[in-house]
Amino acid sequence: STGETPNIFYYPAIAGLKEWAQNGVLLDLTDSLNEDEEWKNTFLDGALDTYDLSAYGVDGIYALPNELNVDAIFYNKALFEKAGIEKTPETMDELYEDIDKLVAAGITPFGVGGKNTWVMGHIFNNILAKRIGRDGIIKLGTGEKKWTDDDVVECLQITKDLKDKGAFAEGFEGMDYNTQMNQFLTGEVAMISHSSPIIPEMFNSESEILDDISFFAFPYFEDKPEYK
């Protein structure tokens, strides 16, 4: 709002950079990258493609990746065993079955810090990715696809259905990230959906269940195998 911008800044969502790039606030890094192959080659194959705004209607690369994250569902092997779950789920139908088994065994399936929307986003965003794919998500960012579109509303409904199945800890709407992590690391809940940067946090903790922690990829929908 002051018209003054820092030389370098961190921004978490690439789609949000579109307006700034269009208004000339950001520097197009394409030429700089092409002129310095050594620098350009320090990035993993495909990493820069994510930051190419041409999909959003603006030609050029206006940001660079600063870390590589992997989303996963972290789970407590001992609680899975207690509920009679013999293997981790690969499909959403298998996840639904495992949730039912956990609930039947008196175990809360997911810890969720619903008070922090970005935490809840780990579940919803994965559902979105597994239903509409990368192209669909890009179209949401450009406005070509609407949040009221049937397939997007379906993703919201699937998230609500998980809540209605008892998948989330009671009162999760008022819980924050720290509460979620505490529940998982003390064995109160069987799973959390998160990304790889939490791994050091978990293993630097004094949790007594570290040997029971493992992870699996967010399950896919059998009718959408192309987004597996």
Whereabouts are the PLM-identified features?
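Hinge/lid segment of periplasmic solute-binding proteins
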Residues: 14-72, 96, 123, 151, ...
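Glycine-centered hinge/linker elements that transmit conformational signals in sensory
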Residues: 99-101, 141-172, 218
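Beta->alpha turn/N-cap motifs
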Residues: 11-15, 177, 194-199, 219
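Extracytoplasmic "Venus flytrap"/periplasmic binding protein-like
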Residues: 1-46, 50, 78-83, 87-90, ...
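Extracytoplasmic/periplasmic solute-binding protein
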Residues: 53-66, 71, 96-145, 160, ...
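Short helix-initiation/N-cap motifs at beta->coil->alpha
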Residues: 1, 15, 92-96, 172-185
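Extracytoplasmic/periplasmic substrate-recognition and gating elements
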Residues: 2, 82-83, 165, 204-228
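Short, solvent-exposed loop/beta-turn-alpha elements that line the ligand-binding surface or hinge
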Residues: 30-46, 114, 131-154, 204-207, ...
